Regions:
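The feature marks proteins involved in alpha-glucan
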Residues: 1-24, 50-135, 141-161, 168
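C-terminal beta-strand-rich structural cap/linker in extracellular carbohydrate-active enzymes
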Residues: 31-33, 592-618
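Active-site-proximal helices and loops of the catalytic beta/alpha 8
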Residues: 239-248, 256-257, 262-273, 327, ...
Length: 618
């Protein structure tokens, strides 16, 4: 039986994907004659406590050999998630979503399709679209000022930049992340030419505020740069110098918790006798929940006593973060291009909306990104479906689903499965959000891409097993080829690619802290960097990579062939995971060869007489 319905196919659903509130959606069914008489209805339900299914009768559109065609138009008025299937109104049959997104006939309830409806005025920064990001873990990138004195005696300086980060428990059995390699803001400034040569447009910096750990997710002072990284003035200099290279700086905002060792909480007493922990009358006391039922006597992030959670609805905290002259306002006016919100799905929607207001008050072109590990439109939290991607909260999110699908594909996952997973995210996310989603293969929270591709899975084994591991020889060589393929996909999918520092030279490492080693500046691995530079140049020059629609032409036998369809240009990308050369037909009717474990990109001007530009990057 042929496909009855597929929301990824423009014949069956127009427009593709999410829609603005008030926009009309056209749906078409293709019913084989063998199903007999049917009277199909669209059954549509908005998700909500008081919402009920609404039935829309579909009109007969005509016949093709052995098939009857029916369609319906529906206007979706309010932002939210809508779910739908089709009732055939005969013999209790319905058409529900099958495993490959195609409609299948069922006599019982099944999976529905989703339509995301977002705010009609939702816009995201145009300056982000079509660009390239680069993530830096500040302590581990580059030491611009050498032999700096440690600002606090409990910080341990690591002079050997090739050393493995500390991973063994200290004398108390804990991991305090007290080893510092000395990376700083001046080191980032020095490397701006290197970054621009790779086509980098934005730097996403892991936390840079004053904090007493090398990762700095335990904020001690929201309004000052960590002294080992530099000063507030040096941050402003970095922003100005980066702007000369066309590079913006996006900061990491950690607002779900502070450090216990902070001027706000001050459990350790570093900041005198003040702070919420030591002083019941502290102005910060209301930021935290103190109760003997909690470990340590206060609520903490996932039970880590060094990370006391804040009440994000406390007026004084909200004002401190989002008010005029507050944390967001201060850093954007110092030169930052935006914020990435740590654990965004653990922040209340109302708080995120106030952060958005603070960001856009400075400029609509300032960027607000959220850390969400799953499909951000379907996340539950605080006893309800999260709404932060519908136009009043985040601009976009970190695209972990793409990362997982791309890495699994280059390792051997069926191409069709990877394509369906990617299309699902593209379908669910509002266009302004998918066009600014941060696409990556490695982060400070995940294993490095080359390790995932080429090394043995950790499978829950601990740090002792992970320590010192790396692949060499044939496994490394093949891994680099597969990594090259993976980045070709990441650079050409909807969204903006983000390169994690060191991936370009084949750095390896399992999870924290092994994925956070110091950048190996004396590495001789130079094969991937020019490829990334060419991919970045292509993104900058081809408008299809800014907002072009994704359309998959073929996904089988290790071949992933897709288009990005822009207003004036169409880019066609063919990725060949197989071990032999393929000859692939293009949408234009011509053919192109694609090397084993390689890729080819063809850019055409839209129109009757397109100009062809072939990019087979070696």
């Amino acid at each position: 039986m042929s496909c009855l319905f597929n929301s990824y196919d423009p014949y069956f659903k127009q427009p593709f994907g999410a829609v603005r509130a008030g926009q009309s959606v056209h749906l078409t069914l293709c019913i084989p004659e063998e199903l007999g008489y049917v009277d199909p209805h669209l059954v549509l339900q908005k998700e909500g406590k008081y919402d009920v299914p609404v039935h829309y009768r579909m009109k007969f559109d005509g016949q093709t050999p052995h098939q009857n065609h029916f369609s319906v138009d529906v206007v979706l008025g309010d932002p939210g998630l809508y779910f739908y299937y089709f009732d055939l109104y005969t013999d209790f049959r319905r058409i529900v979503r099958g495993a490959d997104n195609c409609g299948v006939v069922s006599w019982q309830e099944g999976e529905s399709w989703q339509i995301t409806v977002y705010e009609p005025d939702f816009q995201t920064p145009e300056c982000i679209k079509g660009k390239v990001f680069y993530q830096i873990f500040p302590d581990r990138f580059c030491e611009g000022i050498e032999n700096k004195p440690m600002p606090f005696p409990d910080r341990l300086y690591q002079a050997d930049k090739h050393a493995e980060p500390f991973w063994q428990p200290n004398e108390t059995g804990g991991h305090l992340n007290e080893d510092y390699f000395g990376g700083d803001l001046e080191g980032i400034r020095i490397k701006l030419p290197y970054l621009r040569e790779m086509g980098v447009d934005y730097l996403y910096l892991n936390p840079s505020f004053d904090a007493h750990s090398n990762h700095r997710y335990n904020t001690a002072d929201y309004l000052n740069v960590d002294p080992l990284l530099g000063t507030n003035e040096e941050f402003e200099v970095l922003c100005r110098e980066a702007a000369k290279y066309g590079i913006g700086i996006v900061l990491d905002g950690v607002f779900s918790h502070t450090g216990s060792d902070s001027r706000y909480f001050n459990r350790e007493g570093r900041y005198g006798e003040g702070g919420a922990y030591r002083d019941p009358n502290s102005p910060y006391r209301s930021w935290y929940d103190f109760d003997p039922k909690y470990k340590g006597g206060y609520r903490s992030w996932w039970g880590f006593e060094t990370l006391p959670e804040v009440n994000e609805e406390t007026p004084s905290f909200v004002e401190f973060i989002t008010g005029e002259g507050g944390v967001i306002d201060t850093w954007l006016r110092r030169g930052a291009a935006g914020f990435r919100l740590d654990v965004a799905d653990e922040l209340p929607d109302e708080f995120i909306e106030k952060i958005r207001t603070a960001v856009k008050r400075v400029s609509p072109e300032k960027f607000l990104l959220g850390e969400v590990w799953e499909d951000a439109t379907t996340k539950f939290g605080f006893d309800h479906r999260r709404t932060y991607l519908l136009g009043k909260g985040l601009d976009s999110v970190m695209n972990y689903p793409f990362k997982n699908s791309v890495l699994d594909f280059v390792k051997g996952k069926p191409a069709q499965q990877a394509a369906n997973e990617i299309l699902s995210i593209c379908e669910h996310y509002p266009a302004p959000a998918i066009n600014t989603a941060l696409n990556f293969l490695s982060t400070h929270d995940t294993e490095r891409a080359l390790t995932v591709i080429a090394d043995e899975p950790a499978n829950g084994r601990g740090r002792e097993w992970q320590s010192g591991r790396s692949v060499t020889g044939e496994a490394y060589e093949e891994g680099m080829l597969r990594l090259r393929m993976a980045y070709a996909i990441i650079y050409t999918l909807p969204g903006v690619p983000c390169l994690y520092y060191g991936d370009e030279i084949g750095m390896q490492g399992y999870r924290d802290p092994f994925n956070r080693a110091f950048f190996c500046w004396d590495s001789h691995e130079e094969r991937l960097r020019p490829v990334l530079a060419q991919l970045a140049q292509l993104r900058h020059s081809c408008e299809a990579f800014r907002t072009g629609e994704l359309r998959v032409l073929r996904a089988e036998d290790g071949i992933l062939h897709y288009q990005r369809i822009g207003k004036t240009e169409t880019a066609e990308i063919i990725v060949n995971r197989s071990e032999h050369i393929i000859v692939e037909p293009l949408a234009s009717g011509k053919h192109t060869e694609v090397n084993p474990m390689g890729f080819t990109i063809v850019v055409e001007e839209n129109g009757h007489n397109p100009n062809h530009s072939y990019y087979d990057i070696q």
